[in-house]
Amino acid sequence: MSHAKKLSFLTVLVMMLGLVSPMLHAQAKLSIDKVYSAYLRNSGTISAQGQIKGYFFLYQSDKIDKHTNEYTLQILDENLNKVRNIKFEDSKKLSLLESAFNGSSISFLFKNADNKTLDMKIYDLDGKLKYTYSREYDKKTDDLMKQYETLHTDEGMNKNVFDMGEEGFVSVLPMRDGKQRTYEVDYYSSQTKKQWTYVPTDDAEKYAFAEYLGCTDSLIILEVLKKNHAMSGNPTSHLVGINVVTKKKQFDLDYSDDNQKLLPSYVAPLEGTPNVLIIGPYYDKDDKIGKDFSKGLAVYEMTTTGKVVNKVYNTWSGDFGKYLATNRKGKIDEVGYLYIHKVIRTPDHKLFVVGEGYKRQANAAGIAFTTLMAMGGHVNNSFGVTKIVVTDMVMMEFNDKYKVTGATIYDKTNNTAEASTMSDYNSQHVIANYLKMIGAFDYEFTTGEADNSRFAVCYSDYERSHEYHGQTFNAIQYNGSKFTTDKIQLKSKASTLRVFPAKAGSVMIMEYFKKDKRLDFRLEKLG
């Protein structure tokens, strides 16, 4: 897009959202009636340079006949004023899998059970349907999609459709090819009518599971776990880069030649350089990631060709042990293991890493049930003798050399995320990915200034005290020199509730009242 076109679009965007218009005034609340069905994953924020400019919501607004529904795409500005109201009719068997916003367009990935197609629809911000991309799916792929729909609850965040700046969107979906389970990457342009699909053809392994990590202007970066057997065998972790221009794999790294191997968890472009930053737990070369425990947290700098130019290792027992009580298995006292949610780089070159704890505990109910089943000569395949508990938030600070210089634990209420037999046998990494997939972590989002000079890390919690008993929304706020905490009590009779980032110092709360068929929105000040 040319500089002139960018200026023109931003001018229209600002005028459309009422950011310079005196006719639109800030309001604290908004209600929308006749909402027959609302899914929280069908909603999102509209932002520019890291600042909230509005919101979008897609919901079922009417029933036309026994085969057809009416759907509404509602666009609001940052003060909850209605900006656009787009209605369309489509199949009753239309289900929205994911949605995303990329700065200039909103994308929706639908599964149409009538036509047996996956449909990507891309709208601009004046409500015009720019492009529709469709492709058929078969029964084998549909079985995987049904598992996906079951696992992704309304409380879950976007998992499989991601923005690539103003150029377009990318989706990463499971696929079955005969007995082989693999994945496919679909790219959808929002600038021109262009779409392409990448399916790995050179993987010898029968099972490959891909997770999107991030992107650059020219790369889609994935973590891919590969193995030869569904129920056994040690998976190997690969960092895979797909070139957007050539539509081919640019690199596939498994670090097998190193003394340590990285399990990539987070990828972000390194500002001011063409390189990317990769962060994740690391293991000794001969460790099995499906069974063994990580040795610490590694930070790699990598070029877009896949060449690693810098490696820094921080051990759990040594480096992190100066600030947190950890053991050699990477387990923090009372917190457990860490999942990395966000990496924040500030103007003074500090690096803050947001983690959340999870751990395995004995499951009294599962033990009792297993004992009763065994006494009756039966095998328990439902309840685990252990359970997975999500614990506290952890804020870690690193210097410009990527060495840890501090870490603080922020207490929150432990909650049971998983109590089936899968918690008994799977590794810490597999469990962490599963918790992320089902939306079990309490981390919500990070918001702040465009340059990260000030930011707030937000998460949900549940308080049980004499003064208050119920859900809370919490913020760990950084003002450029120190951290403070804040929280909002979320008493509600709504069927479902979700908190969104909002303009500076506020959050936006959306509630769906299923019985009344009503969506309520309100802005609340932090503090």
What do the predicted segments below correspond to?
Residues M1-S31, G527:
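Bacterial Sec-dependent N-terminal signal peptides
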Residues Q27-G527:
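Secretory-pathway ectodomains
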